[in-house]
Amino acid sequence: NEQANLRLSEANSGTYKTFIGRVREELGSETYRLYGIPVLKHSLSNSNRFYLLTLTSNQDESITLAIDVEDMVAVAYQPAGSHESYFFLNAPQIAFHTLFTDTHQNVLNFDNTFKSLENAAGTTRQTIVLGVDPLDFAISNLFNADPKLLPLSFLVIIQMVLEASKFRFIEQSVAYSFKNEKTFLPDLAIVSLEDNWSEISLQIQASTSLQGLFGSVVELYNSNNELIEVDSIYYPIILANVALQLYHCQVSTGDNECLVETRTTRISGRDALCVDVAGALTSDGSRLILYPCGQQVNQKWTFHSDGTVRSLGKCLATNNSKFGNLVVIYDCSKLAAEDISWDVSVGGTIMNPNYEDLALTSNKATRSTNLTMEVNTYSASQGWRVGNYVQPIIGSIVGLDDMCLEATDGNTNMWLEECVPNQREQSWALYSDGTIRVDDNRELCVTASSSTYDNWKVITILNCDGSNNQRWVFLADGSISTPGNQRLAMDVARSDVDLKKIILHRPHGDLNQQWVLFY
């Protein structure tokens, strides 16, 4: 494997992101993906078990860090030109036979877990400053093998390199620090991701057994230290954030750890309203409506492994000859399996697989609107989030050159401007229906308009109307895409921010189609 190198004397936000991309590529190649997110290899041969990367300080002091490819932890390191190497207390035995074998191998008196490193450093991650200068000092401290400073220095390096490789949110936090030459303290948003990577990976893998639902809730935080309880893959802070997963299990092998048989949650959609059994009526044929989200029992939906979705003891059902295009609840035993079977797509479309071209729809964005089955046009009126956290996710959307999407021209247009913390025009609300709304005025939606640039639709801001040119999906490849089969991606026109044009374009994965939700 070719090593990834980061030389701080030449580093900027761009070279840092290239370095992180290189690490991800090496660890995530030749493996399978779930929802587009690579799962780390496991059961590797000894010769393929470790990956080396080189970090060089501004003073030209280099260290080689050895990473366990199976679980992405630091195992050992060697200062350049030294006959000494240093292994974590919990390094696997095979590491000593494989790594730095021509050196004197020292064993450190702490292991590579955050808990052990924090204890040895006598502090916590949230008090340790991250940024270019702290990384420079950390590399230098490891190069000089100063025992008192090693735990602290590892906490800096592990977060800025390994944790950033796992999560786009952490990578972007570090990229900002390179761009602005400012340091930052890891907040709960960062620490909650770091502490939950293994659990998030397990739940993503388990979710394939039950419509994208997790077997248990993962507690994450946003940058305002507000709790976001995530219980499915249908959140951009999961799907478009996790860059690598730790291998736990494969559902196809019948592994219990990875099996979710039932899960009860809410379904939110248009204008962040919830799917509700009207009046909590339990009689067969009771209709489904949109209603303000609450904790009432008639908004609780239990997903079963047989494809049924149930509330109040009855099955979510559709049958043209019985109910017209209405969606109702009905006694599960009295209907054919094809009337009560449902699929949820990654993009948030809910369909009955036996009615291939129809999708669950809310034709109006008002409370008590009847839910119906309509021809699937991938419109925002057909976008849903299966999950208990129903509020919009608020954040900035970071694109080319670490610049932020900004609502401009009196909230009628949008393009990239330099990111400014807490600037209202750069704050967006991501709704359950797939709309991206101006946080300041949530009647306004990011829209692929009819005006064109170079034959491609220009993306502007218009009143929300539930149409298919206002629905977006944040994907694992870093794109913000339309949800239909003819997928198009949000694109900075010609990679030129000065054109002030954001357009729809065929997906190609270049930097001008890469976006990070900074929430």
Swiss-Prot record:
User: Which Cys pairs are S-S linked?
Assistant: 249-258, 274-293, 315-332, 404-419, 445-464
Glycan attachment sites: 370
Q: Which domain of life is it from?
A: Eukaryota
1-beta repeat ranges, renumbered to this chain: 312-352
InterPro entries in the record: Ribosome-inact_prot_sf (IPR036041), Ribosome_inactivat_1/2 (IPR017989), Ribosome_inactivat_prot (IPR001574), Ribosome_inactivat_prot_sub1 (IPR016138), Ribosome_inactivat_prot_sub2 (IPR016139), Ricin_B-like_lectins (IPR035992), Ricin_B_lectin (IPR000772)
Q: Give all residue intervals belonging to the Ricin B-type lectin domain.
A: 261-387, 390-518
Q: Outline the 1-gamma repeats, range by range.
A: 356-388
Q: Which CDD domains match?
A: beta-trefoil_Ricin_SGSL_rpt1, beta-trefoil_Ricin_SGSL_rpt2
Residues binding a carbohydrate, per UniProt: 276-279, 296-298, 454, 491-494, 505-508, 512
- Family annotation (PROSITE patterns): RICIN_B_LECTIN
Q: Does the keyword Glycoprotein apply?
A: yes
User: Spans of the 1-alpha repeats?
Assistant: 271-311
> What would you give as a GO molecular function for this chain, any one?
rRNA N-glycosylase activity
Recite the UniProt keywords alphabetically.
Disulfide bond, Glycoprotein, Lectin, Repeat
Q: Which GO terms describe its biological process?
A: negative regulation of translation
2-beta repeat ranges, renumbered to this chain: 442-482
Q: Which SMART domains match?
A: RICIN
2-gamma repeat start-end pairs: 486-513
Establish whether keyword DNA-binding is in the entry.
Answer: no
Job of this protein: Seed lectin similar to type 2 ribosome-inactivating proteins. The Aalpha and Abeta chains constitute the rRNA glycosidase domain and the B chain the carbohydrate-binding lectin domain. Is predicted to have no glycosidase activity and, hence, to be non-toxic, due to small changes in both the nucleotide binding and carbohydrate binding capabilities. Binds galactose and derivatives with a preference for the beta-anomeric forms. Binds prophyrins. Has hemagglutinating activity towards rabbit and human erythrocytes.
Write out the domain note: The B chain is composed of two domains with each domain consisting of 3 homologous subdomains (alpha, beta, gamma).
Q: Which family does it belong to?
A: In the N-terminal section; belongs to the ribosome-inactivating protein family. Type 2 RIP subfamily.
UniProt name for this protein: Seed lectin
Q: What is the lineage of its organism?
A: Eukaryota, Viridiplantae, Streptophyta, Embryophyta, Tracheophyta
